Amino acid sequence: MSAKCIMVQGTSSSAGKSVMVAALCRIFSRRGYRVAPFKSQNMSLNSFTTAENREIAVAQVLQAEAAGIEPSHHMNPVLLKPKEDFTSQVIVHGRPAGNMNFQDYQTEFRDTALEAIRESLEYLKSRYELIVIEGAGSPAEINMRDRDLANMEIAHLADADVILVADIDRGGVFASIAGTLMLLDERDRSRIKGVVINKFRGNIDILMPGIERIEEITGVPVLGVLPYDEGLKLPEEDSASLSQRKYRGRGDIRVGVMRLPRISNFTDIDPLEYEEDVAVRLIETGDSLDDLDAIIIPGTRNTISDLIHLEENGFADEIRDLSREIPVFGICGGFQMLGKRILDDARQESSEGSVDGLGLLDCETHFTGEGKIISQSQGRVLGNGIFSGMRGETVEGYELHEGTTVLGDVKPLLRVDRGFGNTRSGGFDGAVDGNVAGTYFHGIFHNFRFRRYFTNLLRERKGIEPLEYLDDNFSASRRFSIDRLAEIVEENMDLSIIEEILEG
């Protein structure tokens, strides 16, 4: 039997669509239904590698976790990863399909993307009872309606009723609801069966006159008002959210994360914020590095451009100097920057051909145009450099990188048991020399024992008692947040529209 579908759209970006889908997946999974999330087309720099070695957005990974199932590339058949010059890398069914600008994508590739979307939707519908679909941005972008691949076009394709989520925290919620509905044509508007007001703070009685009036004006019921809950700790999808999290956590241990202009997979740093005495600070142009206990250089969608940014802003020399005193850790593109040289023979990232790296690790990275490495990975810590006390410890992560790295007179960080690491033939990953280390493994700090060892090293250097390897606050908080999110929605939203769909 083919699954029933419900779709969550928003009056704007960041209205709360992703978390609403996660909540509905959790709620109906707990009620015994086989539920799967779906987002036809996502634009995000935070991605993940599935067990199929396919790349999808992290939002769909969270939603799959909420549904109690393994993530699949069919849950996000088209992923757009912004690059330079208004182009994006287009990922279809978890594999790169090329770099395209908006015009080329719409005129030459749209039909291919739509076919992939249709195929994945049918795949999920044949295997589950309920598909919870997430839209993108707003359905009322009337200049884009005929090119839509994420909102009403998908609602019609899936024959899905739509719940519209509106963010009251940013102001103008009733205008955004009325404006969205007014701008939709009758065929699209008829799909919307209810509105949810999200991120409300205060006494709901004050809101009731507005709710009654907006229902009169639009003829669409308000299904619920969801309170703002600052206690929820869930991964962010957009880099725009970084501006709201310059400082995270409180404590004596200060970890600086370089806010690269083209930062990607910044969820790599999330687990550090759950170490009880660690303060994570995003380092932007003009900030000082003087009071830090460690520096992390994260992933980037353009290693060479962001390396040049560090040089031009004086950060490169500061990092070189501080590496004598404190740990410097690079992930993916950040690891590539730590080496002596980056050779871009294929001119993938720059017309420069090659540039000098930070010179903190004796290695070179080569971009040869051979294609992207996408893999779930596992390795064992070799116990070199600052990780001498972790020898033999198993870590897991995932790889999403172009370029391979050749080591000189420097020790690798990991022996690779599954995946690729520094080269396409596997063997070893990363490098470590004294205080400096790097890896291609995204998610390495999601490994509790690795993270606790790293932060304990920082504690000991400051004369602070190290913490025991007991409770993984990050994993526990994530599970709690998903459950709490589901409870908030269940307590504050009329779910009868979905119940009727399932019973019909």
From Swiss-Prot:
One of its GO terms (biological process) is cobalamin biosynthetic process. It holds the Pfam family CbiA. NCBIfam families: cobQ, PRK00784.1. Keywords: Cobalamin biosynthesis, Glutamine amidotransferase. One of its GO terms (molecular function) is catalytic activity. The keyword Membrane does not apply. Catalyzes amidations at positions B, D, E, and G on adenosylcobyrinic A,C-diamide. NH(2) groups are provided by glutamine, and one molecule of ATP is hydrogenolyzed for each amidation. Pathway: Cofactor biosynthesis; adenosylcobalamin biosynthesis. The keyword Metal-binding does not apply. The active site is at C332 (nucleophile), H442. Belongs to the CobB/CobQ family. CobQ subfamily. Gene3D superfamilies: 3.40.50.880, P-loop containing nucleotide triphosphate hydrolases. HAMAP family: CobQ (MF_00028). This is Probable cobyric acid synthase. InterPro entries: Class_I_gatase-like (IPR029062), CobQ/CobB/MinD/ParA_Nub-bd_dom (IPR002586), CobQ_GATase1 (IPR033949), CobQ_N (IPR047045), CobQ_synth (IPR004459), GATase_3 (IPR011698), P-loop_NTPase (IPR027417). Residues 252-450 form the GATase cobBQ-type domain.
